[in-house]
A protein has these predicted regions:
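Membrane-spanning beta-strand positions in outer-membrane beta-barrel proteins
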Residues: 25-27, 79-81, 126-128, 169, ...
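Predominantly the C-terminal beta-signal and adjacent terminal strand-loop region
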Residues: 37-45, 50-53, 89-95, 162, ...
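Short N-terminal segments immediately surrounding and downstream of signal-peptide cleavage
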Residues: 23-38
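Gram-negative (and chloroplast) outer-membrane scaffold detector with strong preference
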Residues: 34-38, 63-145, 201-211
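Cleavable N-terminal export/targeting peptides
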Residues: 1-25
Length: 211
């Protein structure tokens, strides 16, 4: 629920841009992708126990929403854009089973990326490449459940990123594309424990609607 509230606030802020803007400079998008998310602490727990363990690494898969606005530069072909979104990653789960205790660890992460980019818009029925840079706010939570008791720990971090991609504009209203992103120093630690590590490359399939 908190993630939906955060997304709603962020999209409302971006959509509060002057309403006199040209109609097709606004956009909203969805994406599905895969990125780095190494559950290092869970692996250390797994390596350090003599009991039965089961580690499910699903935290690299993510889905996201975004809102964007593009300024026309010297003409309608060259554009400077800004976009703000929310990416929600899958869970990493570790189960430890002992003769008397059932122990479960779950790691969840979401990110709020803000990106400024340049795009070469070649119109309908053509590819439009773009490159950009920005910052991402990451929040990771590590939850432990033992015999009905629950303990949570979380940490946040802001990191820089680079981004590049291209989209094919099927109509004035819709484009489908591919996007790559590189996060710098996105290892999220607390008290020496690595809650998640999103440093490195990620890629996504994007769908955007312009209006």
């Amino acid at each position: 629920m908190r993630k939906l509230v955060v997304l709603g606030v962020l999209l409302s802020i971006l959509c509060a841009w002057p309403t006199a803007a040209k109609a097709d400079n606004w956009g909203i998008g969805v994406k599905v992708g895969v990125g780095e998310n190494d559950p290092k602490t869970m692996k250390e727990i797994q390596d350090g126990t003599l009991y039965n363990t089961e580690l499910n690494e699903n935290g690299a898969v993510f889905s996201g929403l975004e809102a964007l606005y593009e300024f026309n530069l010297d003409d309608e072909t060259n554009k400077l854009g800004v976009k703000l979104g929310v990416d929600v990653f899958g869970h990493n789960d570790l189960k430890v089973t002992t003769p008397s205790v059932w122990d479960k660890w779950t790691e969840t992460t979401y990110a709020i990326p803000l990106t400024v980019y340049y795009k070469r818009d070649n119109g309908v029925s053509a590819w439009a490449p773009y490159v950009g840079a920005g910052v991402s706010f990451f929040r990771s939570e590590l939850k432990r459940e033992v015999i009905g008791d629950e303990v949570k720990d979380h940490k946040s971090k802001i990191v820089p990123h680079l981004m590049a991609g291209a989209e094919y504009r099927f109509t004035k209203l819709f484009a489908l594309g591919l996007e790559a992103k590189y996060n710098f120093g996105a290892k999220i630690k607390k008290d020496g424990d690595v809650l998640s590590d999103h440093s490195g490359f990620g890629g996504a399939i994007t769908g955007r609607f312009y209006f």
